Amino acid sequence: MSRAHTSRAIAKDLLRASKLPLLPRDESHVEADLKRIHKGKTLSPVLLVRGDLSQGIPLIIADGYHRICAICYFDEDSPVAFRMAALRR
């Protein structure tokens, strides 16, 4: 992943592609990341694994699910920095 290029995507789109529910706003990690956002601090990129729609495999959020949820609470149309890995079979 260290060689993966950092890209950006809209928070709600990543959540939708992962088929995961939005974590509660009062979940401890979401709450902590919301505080960081409100202080203007940058969040680390999330780590994703590309899914395969033809096989019914959704996007996998390997690290940063709570960060995506926090950004959704702040502004669901905000971009999220991410690094993507390919799904290996």
Where are these predicted regions, by residue range?
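Short active-site loop/helix that positions an aromatic residue
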Residues: 58, 65-79
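Amphipathic, charge-rich alpha-helical segments that serve as recognition/docking helices
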Residues: 87-89
